[in-house]
Amino acid sequence: MSDLSKYRNIGIFAHVDAGKTTTTERILKLTGQIHKTGEVHDGESTTDFMEQEAERGITIQSAAVSCFWKDHRFNVIDTPGHVDFTVEVYRSLKVLDGGIGVFCGSGGVEPQSETNWRYANDSEVARIIFVNKLDRIGADFLNVVDQIKNVLGAVPLVMTLPIGREDDFVGVVDILSRQAYVWDDTGLPENYEITDIPADMVDDVEAYREELIETALEQDDDLLEAYMEGEMPTDEQVKMCIRRGTRDCSFFPTYCGSAFKNKGMQLILDAVVDYLPSPTEVDPQPLTDPETGEPTGEVATVSVDAPLKALAFKIMDDRFGALTFIRIYAGKLNKGDTILNSATGKTERIGRMVEMQADQRNELSSAQAGDIIAVVGMKNVKTGHTLCDVKHECTLEAMIFPTPVISIAVTPKDKGGSEKMGIAIGKMVAEDPSFLVHTDEETGETILKGMGELHLDIKVDILKRTYGVDLIVGAPQVAYRETITKPVEDSYTHKKQSGGSGQFGKIDYIMKPGEVGSGFKFTSSVVGGNVPKEFWPAIEKGFKGMMDTGVLAGFPVLDVEIELLDGGFHAVDSSAVAFEIAAKGAFRQSMPKAGAQLLEPIMAVDVFTPEDHVGDVIGDLNRRRGMIKDQMAGVTGSRIKADVPLSEMFGYIGHLRTMTSGRGQFSMEFAHYAPCPVNVAATVIEEVKALNAKK
């Protein structure tokens, strides 16, 4: 039985190209899990094992690896940095207890680092900070520390200082122990010596040490009071306070180094052991009502002796077969056990269990609370499903994923590809909850929906190369929505007579705008028996069913409230079907009267540009109907934040690179829906009508 206090379930988060995957490679090298470190730029990293990852030099999936350091077990997840794959970051945060935020020593706090940091804050995940790439030209550790304070609003607790800058970066000073770690030029992580602090750094180290101790001791009033009276705490007492403050996110221990040059990595591994929480030191996962999704007040207390409670957080189909990644919160899981999937009510028998080393597998006979493992061949499990003891059914808090904002139509080039594509897409949808698919019934086209251009580009590439489906790909389409802007009181009668019993249903109602994000809401204030209560659910069903297809251009409808006021029925001809049809007709009749309006998705765009191109970038965003929200000057350039309609952002990366001579970067994520300008709405509606006319 493993000691849970020696478990560390951690994620590595950062902006694209800040060095997350290289950091993971160095961790695996130092912990003895790999003997030759693979490099991202060579396409050989252990955690980037998809073809598309190796080629593009980015992480697309979150890959789980296990390793050991100083008798502690690390389960490490290397997550994507590109905003189109943020869902991977989100679901990783759901099952982690701590994290390492990696920042580039020259790039500082970049757009996606800010997004990931916000997600980690929302999940209350304890973190340490690693400022990487200090061997690069322009790297400035203390400048990045200032950005972390000013941009993220975080409190970085500086634990190490760099010795030398850029090409002359040779090592780090451990501030608490007052020791210098200096590496030689071989690039080997073990080739270092511990020496005295360089003479020209002594004063700085003492100043930072005093600040470190004062900040840490704020976690313990007695130690702080003694310190103020002149009594120095021991290093162990300071570490205890740092651990406490890190666990509750009061501050974030901050380290510097170069993962690529193997400098400073041992101190980061020590920090994971010393300061990040074990599974028993984080708030337990809440249990929810399976019907309503509301918390029950009970929690999944982390204990090996409790009944099984586990969460399936990722499905992956690789060359070995279907894998279900699960985090075990309570209990034990043995090969051959029969467990319950509380989402489906069906049981599953555990066949093979494996511990992952990226795309390598180690067979397991058992696992316990605190473990992150993969189970081979589960049939009916999806991301977010709870797996539990058959005699102790429970449901863990659900995983909520963002709604796709962009779509493309794809068709196989030959008829034989249809079945192959269907099988492939089924697997891909199971793997990625932010990737949705449906078939256009009129055209027969398959519509792929995703989080951005790169997201869908990768999916098409996987279909073509991994599954061998040759495709015709249409232009990207925006996920518009419709809504109403004013209340309308109306009446509708459905009457049909065709011999024998007919159909009759009359409803009087108010259709009015709902609160933003409220979706559909139905209430009834009918008094008396003019519309018997037994027909109310059918009326609600009819209205709600029409929310999928608006009257302007057939887009889904947002935020509508219906209040049923009165109506009429016929003793023979009225039925649930008649009233459902009446509600559908009422929706079509009243939505135009209620000021139907087209909505477009607005993206929160974060652009980095060299200073001499700021004017061009802002002017271009304005031409794209963007609203500038913020502009921040940095050492290497400026960051511009703007809200821009998605329809104006297709192909933006190429245009930005042209404007900035290849030096500009940007990220964007869905912000909200907003009314389309009249001229834009008219164009969109005409385009939809023209497209429908061709069908």
Curated annotation (Swiss-Prot):
Binding-site list for GTP: 14-21, 78-82, 132-135
Keyword GTP-binding recorded: yes
Cited InterPro entries: EFG_II, EFG_III, EFG_III/V, EFG_IV, EFG_V, EFG_V-like, EFTu-like_2, G_TR_CS
Molecular-function GO term, any one: GTP binding
Keyword GTP-binding appears in the UniProt entry: yes
PROSITE patterns cross-referenced by the UniProt entry: G_TR_1 (PS00301), G_TR_2 (PS51722)
Gene Ontology cellular component terms for the protein in this record: cytoplasm
UniProt-listed SMART domains: EFG_C, EFG_IV
Alphabetical UniProt keywords: Cytoplasm, Elongation factor, GTP-binding, Nucleotide-binding, Protein biosynthesis
Subcellular location: Cytoplasm
Main location: cytoplasm
tr-type G domain sequence ranges: 5-280
GO biological process: ribosome disassembly
Family (UniProt): Belongs to the TRAFAC class translation factor GTPase superfamily. Classic translation factor GTPase family. EF-G/EF-2 subfamily.
Annotated function: Catalyzes the GTP-dependent ribosomal translocation step during translation elongation. During this step, the ribosome changes from the pre-translocational (PRE) to the post-translocational (POST) state as the newly formed A-site-bound peptidyl-tRNA and P-site-bound deacylated tRNA move to the P and E sites, respectively. Catalyzes the coordinated movement of the two tRNA molecules, the mRNA and conformational changes in the ribosome.
Protein name (Swiss-Prot/TrEMBL): Elongation factor G 2
Organism: Photobacterium profundum (strain SS9)
Name of the encoding gene: fusA2
